[in-house]
Amino acid sequence: MDSQELKTLINYYCQERYFHHVLLVASEGIKRYGSDPVFRFYHAYGTLMEGKTQEALREFEAIKNKQDVSLCSLLALIYAHKMSPNPDREAILESDARVKEQRKGAGEKALYHAGLFLWHIGRHDKAREYIDRMIKISDGSKQGHVLKAWLDITRGKEPYTKKALKYFEEGLQDGNDTFALLGKAQCLEMRQNYSGALETVNQIIVNFPSFLPAFVKKMKLQLALQDWDQTVETAQRLLLQDSQNVEALRMQALYYVCREGDIEKASTKLENLGNTLDAMEPQNAQLFYNITLAFSRTCGRSQLILQKIQTLLERAFSLNPQQSEFATELGYQMILQGRVKEALKWYKTAMTLDETSVSALVGFIQCQLIEGQLQDADQQLEFLNEIQQSIGKSAELIYLHAVLAMKKNKRQEEVINLLNDVLDTHFSQLEGLPLGIQYFEKLNPDFLLEIVMEYLSFCPMQPASPGQPLCPLLRRCISVLETVVRTVPGLLQTVFLIAKVKYLSGDIEAAFNNLQHCLEHNPSYADAHLLLAQVYLSQEKVKLCSQSLELCLSYDFKVRDYPLYHLIKAQSQKKMGEIADAIKTLHMAMSLPGMKRIGASTKSKDRKTEVDTSHRLSIFLELIDVHRLNGEQHEATKVLQDAIHEFSGTSEEVRVTIANADLALAQGDIERALSILQNVTAEQPYFIEAREKMADIYLKHRKDKMLYITCFREIAERMANPRSFLLLGDAYMNILEPEEAIVAYEQALNQNPKDGTLASKMGKALIKTHNYSMAITYYEAALKTGQKNYLCYDLAELLLKLKWYDKAEKVLQHALAHEPVNELSALMEDGRCQVLLAKVYSKMEKLGDAITALQQARELQARVLKRVQMEQPDAVPAQKHLAAEICAEIAKHSVAQRDYEKAIKFYREALVHCETDNKIMLELARLYLAQDDPDSCLRQCALLLQSDQDNEAATMMMADLMFRKQDYEQAVFHLQQLLERKPDNYMTLSRLIDLLRRCGKLEDVPRFFSMAEKRNSRAKLEPGFQYCKGLYLWYTGEPNDALRHFNKARKDRDWGQNALYNMIEICLNPDNETVGGEVFENLDGDLGNSTEKQESVQLAVRTAEKLLKELKPQTVQGHVQLRIMENYCLMATKQKSNVEQALNTFTEIAASEKEHIPALLGMATAYMILKQTPRARNQLKRIAKMNWNAIDAEEFEKSWLLLADIYIQSAKYDMAEDLLKRCLRHNRSCCKAYEYMGYIMEKEQAYTDAALNYEMAWKYSNRTNPAVGYKLAFNYLKAKRYVDSIDICHQVLEAHPTYPKIRKDILDKARASLRP
């Protein structure tokens, strides 16, 4: 590290208050840069902050005359004297006078270091004075501006961060300044731009890999982005570089507590952390204290963890026994450990140290409440109430009021209102905080679980029936618990409570899943086994229920004292038909101390008694039922009478009435059952349940739909609320009367128009019945009554499906026509609407409007993502996915507009949101490939294949890239891998055939056809197979056979268009000649000008024209390609007027389409046919300067060959050879390139070399082109290879017996040369 890096490190440790670290780095600085007094100054400061005041004073005195640090040394002397137990007033006055004197003439560096020191000791305003003066005298020092920016952001005020960011950016203009980069990252983090901050930190790591605070910052930012895996990985990297890194060890311990719930590992890490603190910050009491806070609040009261952090707290208190907050925290620790008397002792100590400590007094009152000292606690709370205005609203204080109200048996509504207030106050302090250590401390899961437990004591103990609206208290509980479990998933108690709430809500599957999670992590969790038994029972899984009860008992014998345990056991025995055992079990439950009867006259308002009442009644009711099932009607009636007497006047009384009706029904007395239920009035708690029971009797026993509906109508009339109308609507749906159901749903909506879920449910129900017009009418009517955007979205989505684009556009514009919103849900809804609007515009072909809508959606989504991580963490993945979708759509539109740079930018942004989205990664890779950026494409494909090894498109792209790098083996390997997994993947096979052609290995193709046939016996009937066969035959010089196979694929939807294009090309150029070329024209002149040949060409052109009419392009580029082919047909006629017409079209396309290779080649070919060679050459030279791409590969090859032809005609053989070698680099099977090379060698009379090239041309034309055979035989003759010459002559004559001249010119001469 250089001097500047060491100073930045010191500044970082000063701000983090790691003073022993300051000492160590300063010592290193003195060792390396002894002449720099700044290191000596910070050595003295570190010494001072470790409590060695006299030693520090001596060190400051020794450097106070050093120019650069004189001012800060004097300020430090004043600070040190004031920290001393007996301050030297005279020395302070003397130093103060010298400060005032020196400040007047202080230089730039002196002012800077003074400002820096004042910032470190927390005197921001004074520091700003010094820095402003320093900036003024230095004419805008960047170093000064960077420090000023640090001052701005450590004040933590939003208006300052914008200005600070500008200063940091200015400070970075001359290079990478670690201090400025660290500040920029901090600034971006404060603005909740965690990704931007992370990028900045990565910049530090790249440029300064040994600067460990950057890794610490990276680790914390990754946690803020809620990426625990990356956080832990960075912590591990840190520990590899510094095994005693406090922050990394703390993060690892926190990970095991919060994320994994692995208490053993967390305990080990905490022990390591304690040892590290002893070694690295032995005097840092505040650090020992700070480290404990997050653990005590997230460990679920684990005694093992609490003991470890108690040791750290005691160490903090021993280092600074005057610190009241340390004693207060020790008191809190004792409460968590259940040691109330010791907690009281510590709280008293804290209040002795600081009489004004509110937190100590709050803890003290909590102890009084636990001990039942209600009067004393009440008095103390009254006192705190009086001073609450000055101390601000405190969730803990409101909670104590709620606990006191419960202890005093206050009304339920009063207690619940207090608990609601506790939650609102508690969560308000979390706003804007990123996920991190401070968030864990402030969230305080332990406190939240206490509140949830209090809520649950007011909730019904019986699970809700299906379709029953959720109890508001349960909804509140689930909201709190989900917040906790998202942040601290390792806290099993939270998961258990979620399971309990889900069970009570009637969501049995969710309850089961959460309990399974609990028991996987802690098999001995007795309460979880007990709740799981209830879950199994509700699912009719009786044997599993019994097993859970046995496990529960084996882990905790105390459950035998729970009435609930016996109740579940009896219910399971009843389900198994063990009625006598169930009766015994219930009688055992009745004898438990908790079941002692209390008459109506001795009712208690104590809520715990009420909770027990629910379980007690359940045992009575179960006993009634089992006696009935056992044929003991008299016993059942007797228990029922006992229950009526026992629970008369309680909230459970109506349950007894319903049980009485059930008993009558079981005895077959339907009339008595209905009569009993009829007596339940609307004023009684279980009125709805009673009427539902009546309705059930009418429908199942009387088969009377009219009376069934009458019950629900009565509920709606007597209790005209949304829930009642919802039940009525569901009842109508149950008897298949949807029109009446809709009326009921509308009444529910009229009373609760803001219930978007209800409104959406109704609309979607209409859609499911295919009643689209009614659904639209409903949505429109609902919107007129003031419904919000969620219904607009549903309506617009329906209109889009129905292709009513204009109406969809109007609906969405209406939804978005409002004042700017800040509510997170409203921002989310606006974002969704903008995305849907963009889809509508795309369908309407209003591309500009579509892009505008997407840009607005992107801006909205950026705002959502900044807030959603803290406000709705469970929504983060969906919102990131939407952000990625928006960026990807913008990128697609950019590609359509040929703005590739913009497209790349947005695809990359999409991947920031969804790093592993395969579709986006693939599109970006394709774009890189099209932009001729193979390295980026390769990286993207490699990343994609890491997550999806079988991705076909990525594998094919990798093959293309390997080919470009001339790594042919790898290219073929990638495609072979795909084909070995799926031999009948014809898309891959077609690409492999092309690649093997370019590799010069077409002889390897047939085995892949065999593989496909083995995989699929009907392969030969597949259009894809026929297409691939045609391709292979075309490439191996069998155009007629190729046409036959392409013809079999030409009607197929997937393969037809490509087959047609290939057939047209074969028709126009069956022998693969260089169209427009002149080199071989004269050699084959007598063949080319024959009448038979001309007639054949005309027939082929007519066939091509017919085939063109079958082409049905679906894209803009497809239509351009069709025009190109049409004009190649015109050129094929060789008629001047047709060629000129084609030339005009090609020119037009080339003018409108940037660098359109096929059009440019078309122009050059037309010029050649028109004998305007210079103009042709100019176009071909343009193409020769362009970068090769796979899409235009064939056109590139043809243009290079044509240009080589021109050069050969002009005897510019070197230039021609370069182009021909380029052809062969990209296509080793290019027989025309070999033929031209052979021709050049022949002209240069290098017959041996000519023969070698003609050999390759003969090989890759599959020995089917007699002209090539003739030339090869001729050059063998010239090279005196007579036998080889004779062999080739025989091969040519065998296939073409009348081929002219070869017998006379070559065969006879070769034979003559062999004769002695």
Swiss-Prot record:
Q: What GO molecular function annotations does the UniProt record carry, in alphabetical order? A: chromatin binding
Substitution effect: I1208S: Found in a patient with Bardet-Biedl syndrome; probably acts as a disease modifier; the patients also carries two mutations in BBS1; functionally null mutation in vitro
| Keywords assigned | Cell projection, Ciliopathy, Cilium, Cytoplasm, Cytoskeleton, Disease variant, Intellectual disability, Joubert syndrome, Meckel syndrome, Nephronophthisis, Obesity, Repeat, TPR repeat
Q: Reported effect of changing R939W?
A: Functionally null mutation in vitro
Q: What is its main location?
A: cytoplasm
| Outcome following mutation: Q869R | Found in a patient with Meckel-Gruber like syndrome; uncertain significance; hypomorphic variant in vitro
Q: Name one GO cellular component term.
A: ciliary tip
Annotated effect of mutating P209L: In NPHP12; also found in a patient with Bardet-Biedl syndrome carrying two variants in BBS4; hypomorphic variant in vitro
Q: Name one GO biological process term.
A: cerebellar Purkinje cell differentiation
Q: What is the effect of changing R867C?
A: In JBTS11; functionally null mutation in vitro
What is the annotated localization of this protein? Cytoplasm, Cytoskeleton, Cilium axoneme
TPR repeats sit at 108-141, 145-178, 180-211, 285-323, 324-357, 492-525, 563-596, 617-650, 722-755, 757-789, 791-822, 831-864, 884-917, 919-951, 952-985, 1023-1056, 1197-1230, 1232-1264, 1266-1299
Oligomeric state and partners?
Component of the IFT complex A (IFT-A) complex. IFT-A complex is divided into a core subcomplex composed of IFT122:IFT140:WDR19 which is associated with TULP3 and a peripheral subcomplex composed of IFT43:WDR35:TTC21B. Interacts directy with WDR35 and TTC21B. Interacts with TTC25.
Biological role: Component of the IFT complex A (IFT-A), a complex required for retrograde ciliary transport and entry into cilia of G protein-coupled receptors (GPCRs). Essential for retrograde trafficking of IFT-1, IFT-B and GPCRs. Negatively modulates the SHH signal transduction.
| Disease as annotated in the protein's UniProt record | Ciliary dysfunction leads to a broad spectrum of disorders, collectively termed ciliopathies. Overlapping clinical features include retinal degeneration, renal cystic disease, skeletal abnormalities, fibrosis of various organ, and a complex range of anatomical and functional defects of the central and peripheral nervous system. The ciliopathy range of diseases includes Meckel-Gruber syndrome, Bardet-Biedl syndrome, Joubert syndrome, nephronophtisis, Senior-Loken syndrome, and Jeune asphyxiating thoracic dystrophy among others. TTC21B is causally associated with diverse ciliopathies. Nephronophthisis 12: An autosomal recessive disorder resulting in end-stage renal disease. It is a progressive tubulo-interstitial kidney disorder histologically characterized by modifications of the tubules with thickening of the basement membrane, interstitial fibrosis and, in the advanced stages, medullary cysts. Some patients manifest extra-renal features including retinal, skeletal and central nervous system defects.
Q: Which family does it belong to?
A: Belongs to the TTC21 family.
Protein name in the entry:
Tetratricopeptide repeat protein 21B
Give the organism the record lists: Homo sapiens
